[in-house]
Amino acid sequence: MRSTQEIKATLQSAKPLLMARYPIESLALFGSFARGEATEQSDVDILVEFNGSIGWQFLTLADELETLLGLKVDLVSRKGVKPRYFEYIQKDLIYV
């Protein structure tokens, strides 16, 4: 199983290329990997904030992140998170 540090390092290395391909403002880990509670069955929860329209490229980005990390990714748009849920995940965020 990959560690949180390995995932963070992989995302940091790929971030410039991802930002060139997609209108990404920021990326952050949250959930079990961010809390250090991940198991073999855990997916990688990633919150992404965009600085432009993403449309169908959202799905392409999710697939690219899964390939990059070799793990199932749950990609969540910051604009798609309701305020009450954001309060819950905000404390877990690890920005890359």
What residue spans do the PLM features occupy?
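Conserved histidines in hydrophobic membrane contexts and catalytic metal-binding motifs
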Residues: 29
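Catalytic core of pol beta-like nucleotidyltransferases
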Residues: 1-26, 35-40, 51-96
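Short hydrophobic/aromatic beta-strand micro-patches
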Residues: 47-49
